[in-house]
Amino acid sequence: KEFGFDGVVVSDWGAVKHRAKSLKAGIDLAMPYSADYGKQLADWYEKGLIDEGDLDRSVGRLRELAEKYRSAVSRRRVTMTEEQKHELAVRAAEESAVLLKNDDDILPVCKDKKIAVIGGFAENPEFQGGGSSRVNAKVSQSLCDCLKNLGFNVDFALGYMIRYNILTPFGIRYAVETAAKNDCAVVCVGNTWLTEKEETDRFSLKLNSAAEDLILDVAQVNPNVIVVIYAGSAVDVSAFEGKVKAILYMGYCGEGANEAAADLISGRVSPCGKLAETFPKSLEDTATADRRGNGYSERYPEGVLVGYKYYEYSGIAPAYPFGYGLSYTCLLYTSPSPRDRTR
């Protein structure tokens, strides 16, 4: 009533504990379906705790939504081909990726350089989180193939296996040998959907130890390491940030992830993405550092100081602030002078 909203109110999945009480509170559609919901409504109706008016109002809103949907579907015209949709997915990934670090302008990589691509995510990228967000992509290419298509000489090494959705060390020696004989090494790491999903919180901002150890091992034999991160939220990169030349944060950017990564690494596209959240230096710098939850519930005593506002208010310097993102463009300002615009 306060917001003037007259549409359908839908619950989050599994959020309704009592269907009849939720109906009185304004929930029209409780998800997912449960046969117990009907029993609760019938029981409360027989007891006089809800009436026909409560039911009719809710059903009326649902019918109105169904009519609007049917009308919208009849007017919908899909004009994009599958190829055009994929091109859009690649462009969205290119414009969403964030370049966090680029020392000595290691990126973009020249085509005469030999590249070692290391990590299972290079072959099978994790481009979405777990839970209701997961979809089956129609197209997914390996980073090696994408770089080869752009004319690069590429060697691949696994470096780790993804077993039960956990990164496990595998073929470290071969990965290090491969990195040593190439001009630069692109190490692809990140979090699997088991770590980044709905219903639970992460217990750490760090990457899996197998990923961090792989980066450090490769950095010992090759001074030109480029780390590509596939993850759904902030990552603590302090363990390897000082050992590598570049960090490219791809996030979870859909089916075009590796094509976009190749375009960014090659310089075919210049990075333009900006962070949508602050990346702290460590978990201890966050507002939740002193109140580790149980993974399923959380309190927010910081009030309105959620996210980047907390760091500004507390004076804690983050690793990468909200809105941060590098590009391949260099700007130089010299001798600025004010102009009188009153004339």
Where are these regions (language model features)?
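Generic alpha-helical segment signature
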Residues: 33-34, 55, 89
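Long, well-ordered, tryptophan-enriched scaffold segments
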Residues: 26, 40, 45-72
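Short coil/turn segments at secondary-structure boundaries
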Residues: 54-58, 73-78, 108-111, 278
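A short alpha/beta connector and helix-capping loop motif
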Residues: 20-33
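Helix-enriched interaction subdomains in cytosolic or periplasmic regions
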Residues: 67-95
